[in-house]
């Protein structure tokens, strides 16, 4: 008898396939140099309601300081963001999107939204609702078991 499929394995597989599909869509639209993390950081900065510093990126995404430094240096070199000295504390550098960074964010989001729409076109509203309900149930259970948030 065949062993029952693992939900965790299926989630990992779907995640990999979706990320690969989005990367392919982005590359076809000319955004092949945008990494997933660059995209997340662009979005974080774009939607920020307050000044953002490197420490915010480190804590929000759970990334080491040295890694964030390298990512931000590359993003600054590509012209997506600037680091300016905070007017209240010269030790801190405020991160701000450039006009290019804003444009890249909006353009990549349009490509990603279109890719999501195409991927989800095969499921009904009810299937989508049930999927979210089941995933949320699994998340809450894992958090309960592991003591996570």
Question: At which residue positions do the language-model features occur?
Answer:
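C-terminal regulatory/oligomerization modules of transcriptional regulators
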Residues: 1, 125-149
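N-terminal leader segment of winged-helix/HTH proteins
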Residues: 1-32
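Short alpha-helical elements of helix-turn-helix
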Residues: 8-9, 33-43, 66
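Pre-recognition alpha-helix immediately N-terminal to the DNA-recognition helix
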Residues: 21, 40-43, 103, 130
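Short, locally clustered residues in the helix-turn-helix/winged-helix DNA-binding domain
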Residues: 43-47, 109, 136
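Short capping segments at the starts of secondary-structure elements
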Residues: 48-53
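Charged, amphipathic alpha-helical coiled-coil/dimerization segments
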Residues: 73-133
């Amino acid at each position: 008898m065949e062993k029952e499929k693992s939900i965790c394995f299926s989630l990992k597989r779907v995640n990999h396939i979706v990320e690969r599909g989005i990367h392919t869509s982005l590359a076809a639209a000319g955004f092949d140099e945008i990494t997933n993390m660059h995209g997340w950081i662009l979005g974080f900065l774009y939607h920020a309601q307050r000044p953002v510093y490197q420490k915010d990126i480190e804590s929000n995404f759970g990334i080491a300081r040295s890694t964030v430094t390298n990512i931000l240096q590359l993003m600054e070199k590509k012209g997506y963001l600037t680091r300016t000295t905070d007017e209240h504390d010269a030790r801190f550098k405020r991160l701000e999107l450039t006009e290019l960074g804003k444009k890249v964010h909006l353009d990549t989001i349009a490509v990603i939204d279109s890719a999501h729409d195409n991927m989800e076109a095969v499921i009904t509203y009810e299937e989508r609702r049930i999927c979210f309900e089941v995933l949320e149930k699994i998340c809450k259970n894992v958090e309960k078991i592991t003591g996570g948030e």
